[in-house]
Each structure stands twice: as structure tokens, then as C-alpha cells.
């Protein structure tokens, strides 16, 4: 039995609190998350998408970085339904990696960057991702998992590389306090591929197949704060 517009609105008590002129119904976008990013870049290219310690990235810049990392991941074998673990704090590289995986039709799997080796291991055993984009501070933690659980491909992220130049230079000052601060933000990550190598790739060809709205985008294990 069809329901009338007046009957439908009567069930939405919150409508009474909308400001005048606020639409009660909107048309939802039908594209993928990457399509939405691309649309924002086309419409608001020069507007700021990300601000990180004062370093600003516009929507146009973000889309280009996403496309470059997507090409780098494609060369690493990532494609449709490939599961890619992301283990980073909130930083620009995290946003870029997220959309780059989705551009390829891959599946993002978020890990809490402060998990213990056992907690990471349980999650890897469950989702079986064999490639991970990882904060340099987490690489050593993953190395303490059982060898058969550690992803064969690790891409390391130095979050300080996304900071303004003045802060990056400041983190090189030869003082105890600065050394401690830098040590809290970045570690050496041998036998990994630096994220910057992906950013150095040419943008992925626009003809590369895109995911559909029915494609799996994320396997979400964390509480949603990452």
C-alpha cells in the first residue's frame, strides 16, 4: 500500500526543526566514493580539502595524488577486490591511500595503529590482506607477528613528509626535545617501499576500470575513529 507524502512527513518529527528552506528530501549521489572525490575536484578544485599542521592540499591536488598512488598500487598488483590494510594515524597519506585503493576497486581494511602485534595478527589472519600501507612507527610491530601473517608487501608512510617545510626542518634541530618528538613521529622502516615512490608515479590512466556502487569498499574492524 502506497504512503502519501503527508503521511510520510508525519512520521518524521524532526522535520519540524529544519530551518526554513531546508529540503526534506535530497537526491543521493549514485557514483562511487572515488567518483564523489573526482566530482569535488572538478567543481571545487582550488578549495582546501585537507589541512595538516598548516599544510594545505586542494581538491585538485588531492585527486592527482590519489591517481598517482593508485597507479603505484596497480604496479604492486592491487586491483579489483584486492584487500589492502591501512595502518596509519589521521594524516594526508591516509586519505590518499584510502581513495587510491578504491580507485582500483580494491577493498580498504583499517587497522588501529596502536594495536599490539597479537591484535594486528588476529585481524590479518581474518582478512588475509597481503599488502599494507603502514606508518613507519608500526612496521616494527608488524615484524613481531608470526612470519606467515606479515604481509609480503609493506609500503611505509613517514607522516612528517606531509607537514609544512618549516616543521620538517624544525624536526631536524639537534636538541634532546626535538629528537624525542621526531622519534615519536617516525622510525626507520627497512625492507619496505616508501610511500613517496607511489606518489612519484604517473597518474593512473583514466580508462582503467572503475568500481561500481555495488563494489565492496571497506572491511571495517575499528571503532570508526581512524
Model-identified regions with their sequence ranges:
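Helix N-cap/beta->alpha junction signal
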Residues: 88-90, 135-136, 215
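Alpha-helix N-cap/start motif
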Residues: 80-81, 108, 213
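Conserved S/T- and glycine-rich ATP-binding loop of Class I adenylate-forming
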Residues: 62, 84, 101, 132, ...
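Flexible, non-catalytic linker and terminal segments flanking ANL/adenylate-forming cores
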Residues: 1-30
Amino acid at each position: 500500500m502506497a504512503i502519501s507524502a503527508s503521511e510520510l512527513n508525519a512520521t518524521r518529527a524532526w522535520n519540524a526543526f529544519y530551518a526554513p528552506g531546508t529540503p526534506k528530501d535530497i537526491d543521493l549521489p549514485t557514483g562511487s566514493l572515488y567518483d564523489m572525490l573526482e566530482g569535488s575536484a572538478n567543481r571545487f578544485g582550488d578549495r582546501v580539502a585537507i589541512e595538516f599542521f598548516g599544510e594545505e592540499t586542494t581538491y585538485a591536488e588531492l585527486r592527482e595524488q590519489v591517481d598517482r598512488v593508485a597507479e603505484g598500487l596497480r604496479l604492486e598488483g592491487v586491483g579489483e577486490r584486492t584487500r589492502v590494510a591501512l595502518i596509519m594515524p589521521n594524516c594526508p597519506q591516509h586519505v590518499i591511500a584510502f581513495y587510491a585503493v578504491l580507485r582500483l576497486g580494491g577493498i580498504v581494511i583499517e587497522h588501529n595503529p596502536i594495536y599490539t602485534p597479537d591484535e594486528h595478527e588476529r585481524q590479518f589472519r581474518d582478512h588475509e590482506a597481503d599488502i599494507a600501507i603502514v606508518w613507519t612507527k608500526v612496521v616494527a610491530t608488524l615484524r613481531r607477528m608470526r612470519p606467515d601473517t606479515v604481509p609480503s608487501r609493506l609500503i611505509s608512510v613517514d607522516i612528517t613528509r606531509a607537514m609544512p617545510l618549516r616543521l620538517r626542518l624544525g624536526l631536524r634541530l639537534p636538541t634532546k626535545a626535538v629528537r624525542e618528538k621526531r622519534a615519536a613521529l617516525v622510525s626507520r622502516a627497512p625492507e619496505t617501499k616508501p610511500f613517496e615512490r607511489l606518489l612519484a608515479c604517473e597518474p593512473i590512466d583514466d580508462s582503467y576500470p572503475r568500481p561500481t556502487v555495488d563494489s565492496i569498499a571497506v572491511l571495517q574492524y575499528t571503532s570508526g575513529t581512524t
